[in-house]
Amino acid sequence: MVACRAIGILSRFSAFRILRSRGYICRNFTGSSALLTRTHINYGVKGDVAVVRINSPNSKVNTLSKELHSEFSEVMNEIWASDQIRSAVLISSKPGCFIAGADINMLAACKTLQEVTQLSQEAQRIVEKLEKSTKPIVAAINGSCLGGGLEVAISCQYRIATKDRKTVLGTPEVLLGALPGAGGTQRLPKMVGVPAALDMMLTGRSIRADRAKKMGLVDQLVEPLGPGLKPPEERTIEYLEEVAITFAKGLADKKISPKRDKGLVEKLTAYAMTIPFVRQQVYKKVEEKVRKQTKGLYPAPLKIIDVVKTGIEQGSDAGYLCESQKFGELVMTKESKALMGLYHGQVLCKKNKFGAPQKDVKHLAILGAGLMGAGIAQVSVDKGLKTILKDATLTALDRGQQQVFKGLNDKVKKKALTSFERDSIFSNLTGQLDYQGFEKADMVIEAVFEDLSLKHRVLKEVEAVIPDHCIFASNTSALPISEIAAVSKRPEKVIGMHYFSPVDKMQLLEIITTEKTSKDTSASAVAVGLKQGKVIIVVKDGPGFYTTRCLAPMMSEVIRILQEGVDPKKLDSLTTSFGFPVGAATLVDEVGVDVAKHVAEDLGKVFGERFGGGNPELLTQMVSKGFLGRKSGKGFYIYQEGVKRKDLNSDMDSILASLKLPPKSEVSSDEDIQFRLVTRFVNEAVMCLQEGILATPAEGDIGAVFGLGFPPCLGGPFRFVDLYGAQKIVDRLKKYEAAYGKQFTPCQLLADHANSPNKKFYQ
């Protein structure tokens, strides 16, 4: 039973839902400081209870930095030494954030394994003192309690949390290629059981406060307060503090017991884990699952299992030592550096570098109720934007509105929304067949078919009815925005907003500016994207922009590899084993063969031989036979509703046979096939930076990983060049250039990096 539970919870772990870590917005307010010399921690005494307030300066979140560690140790030593203090409360002064985890910059600054290991051991010592405190300590949790923050909280004798959506607890270290390094791998299994602890540590998922209480991670819940004389956030923190003080006094007076009664299932699970055979089966099954899903690309999950196992089998001392050692090893790996780089990139791409727009977008209109248009509508109404969804036909409009409702209803099924909240959000959407109400629109996003003449027509129609300040954004994936804006009376108000499908799940938004796009238009587009919860890259206009331009040459190589006789299943296996979340052949089916054909033709005309490779006739014949991919039920594979397993489409055999190419043995090993795909992608990405399409390598990495599925463990194309080596990539390209020609010619910037070993995209 225990093994089944462990396998069940790990089934949600895929390689890799990387870096979906949340960014929590926290508003600072000032608390009185006991000592002016302290900048991160202050405390006051209420009766015989010390209230320790955490407040990292100049930051929206509290992070466990060296400075905070030092001040926290100093404060706690004063509390333990005082005869007037009998208990303590730990609370944050920042609404929406208890402690968000360790300071990643502190970890990134470490140059040696020994430095990182020492950081872990120091954190373990501080947290152990909390756990062994003779004076009861209550953690009062409001907002994000993640990583090291959770490790601090579970070492306290009691935990109280606000029952609020912003209050989440979790161990996201695995998403950064690391593991909990302050004793979490040892305390968490004892607190919630081994299966639940492994689930938290291996997936990095966050748990809401009500769920945390059921698990035993939290002892009491406090309802958040509404508005009053003070803002709701401030009132809630004050109330949480009052409740925590009451419980701290009760613990000191022995009127409240810190021990929690466990349920029958927990007791049975705990008993089962005392049986050596059961434990070994759990370890074995979990390790098998992890190996299958990570494909050996991410070292952290297996080391987490190893550390947990060490603590259970050899005792806590051995477990803590193993934890600090493995923590040090992991933080120094290329995978961890790549994932931490992506985290920093996300932070960068969640800021509006254009500043605040002159006018907030409150009313949005979307043209086209297809898959993309409806998806954009969903992420807009979900964030409170009044949205018009327009289409030319009632059938398409109804289908689009149903898609939005279904997306919201799925959240109800997952208990992320109530039915009332769903209906309230859905009421923000208005579906219509005409332009009524567009005179109030602040922004119009067109999501019509990829046809320039059609986009010109709707742009002219829209400009006849929208107000002067209204922005026109095109959700094109490849057509140059300047060509779309050519018929506009106000080209400074035209911009590209390239969303990715499915819109409600894909994090990336690629914003495209032309030479005529105004700064305020850019600021408004970024502001809308951020409100929709997107990670945003801003690129210059050009055929294919950045993401489509990187994907197109790789897809051309996919076609050539298929023509050379590699079957789609093997090609998928080779690409996923390299770290791509979706196989290359499956990706064509998911994107749509007709879309791939359209992009290949358009970009092929612009870039010529350099974008060549496979014969696009393959895609043309597939489209003529109706093999459009998943949406038509057939592509390279056959798709059936409700059936996960997909078989090869045998009707493709004749098409592939008619276009078969002889493979070149010197460049056809499995490794060569992988690198033929990846080097074309990387070379094009670097060329985009060289040409100024991209502003920074960080945006290039974020766009590639979050928009195109470039392997997160490699950190994106630019981080990959730094970690793998520019010279090695150029050598690969030259090898393939000798076999295939200009398609593999290294771009100048990449060659420059190869010729100067000290030259890096990230310093």
From Swiss-Prot:
Known catalytic reactions: a (3S)-3-hydroxyacyl-CoA = a (2E)-enoyl-CoA + H2O; a 4-saturated-(3S)-3-hydroxyacyl-CoA = a (3E)-enoyl-CoA + H2O; (3S)-hydroxyoctanoyl-CoA = (2E)-octenoyl-CoA + H2O; (3S)-3-hydroxydodecanoyl-CoA = (2E)-dodecenoyl-CoA + H2O
Site feature: Important for hydroxyacyl-coenzyme A dehydrogenase activity: H498
Per the record, the GO terms for biological process are:
cardiolipin acyl-chain remodeling; fatty acid beta-oxidation; response to insulin
**Could you tell me where this protein is found in the cell?**
Mitochondrion; Mitochondrion inner membrane
Under what conditions is it induced? Up-regulated by thyroid hormone (at protein level).
UniProt keyword annotation of DNA-binding present: no
According to the UniProt entry, which residues carry Phosphothreonine? T395
Q: Which residues carry this modification: N6-acetyllysine?
A: 46, 60, 129, 166, 214, 249, 289, 295, 303, 326, 334, 350, 353, 406, 411, 460, 505, 519, 540, 569, 644, 664, 728, 735, 759
Enumerate the InterPro entries for this protein.
Answer: 3-OHacyl-CoA_DH_CS, 3-OHacyl-CoA_DH_NAD-bd, 3HC_DH_C, 6-PGluconate_DH-like_C_sf, ClpP/crotonase-like_dom_sf, Enoyl-CoA_hyd/isom_CS, Enoyl-CoA_hydra/iso, Fa_ox_alpha_mit
Sites of N6-succinyllysine modification: 46, 60, 166, 213-214, 230, 249, 303, 326, 334, 350, 406, 411, 415, 440, 460, 505, 519, 569, 634, 644, 646, 664, 728, 759
Any one of the GO CC terms = mitochondrial fatty acid beta-oxidation multienzyme complex
Any Pfam family hit? 3HCDH_N
Keyword Lyase found: yes
Which EC number(s) are documented for this chain? 2.3.1.-, 4.2.1.17, 1.1.1.211
Q: Write down which residues bear the modification named Omega-N-methylarginine.
A: R399
**Residues with Phosphoserine modification:** S316, S419, S650, S756
Any one Gene Ontology MF annotation carried by this entry is: long-chain fatty acyl-CoA hydrolase activity
Q: Where is the transit peptide?
A: 1-36
Subunit record text: Heterotetramer of 2 alpha/HADHA and 2 beta/HADHB subunits; forms the mitochondrial trifunctional enzyme. Also purified as higher order heterooligomers including a 4 alpha/HADHA and 4 beta/HADHB heterooligomer which physiological significance remains unclear. The mitochondrial trifunctional enzyme interacts with MTLN.
Give the family this protein belongs to, as stated in its UniProt record: In the N-terminal section; belongs to the enoyl-CoA hydratase/isomerase family. In the central section; belongs to the 3-hydroxyacyl-CoA dehydrogenase family.
Write down the disease named in this UniProt entry. Mitochondrial trifunctional protein deficiency 1: An autosomal recessive metabolic disorder of long-chain fatty acid oxidation, biochemically characterized by loss of all enzyme activities of the mitochondrial trifunctional protein complex. The disease phenotype ranges from a fatal form characterized by early-onset cardiomyopathy, cardiac failure and early death to less severe, late-onset forms with myopathy, recurrent rhabdomyolysis, and sensorimotor axonal neuropathy as key features. Long-chain 3-hydroxyl-CoA dehydrogenase deficiency: The clinical features are very similar to TFP deficiency. Biochemically, LCHAD deficiency is characterized by reduced long-chain 3-hydroxyl-CoA dehydrogenase activity, while the other enzyme activities of the TFP complex are normal or only slightly reduced.
Q: What does this protein do?
A: Mitochondrial trifunctional enzyme catalyzes the last three of the four reactions of the mitochondrial beta-oxidation pathway. The mitochondrial beta-oxidation pathway is the major energy-producing process in tissues and is performed through four consecutive reactions breaking down fatty acids into acetyl-CoA. Among the enzymes involved in this pathway, the trifunctional enzyme exhibits specificity for long-chain fatty acids.
Official protein name in the record? Trifunctional enzyme subunit alpha, mitochondrial
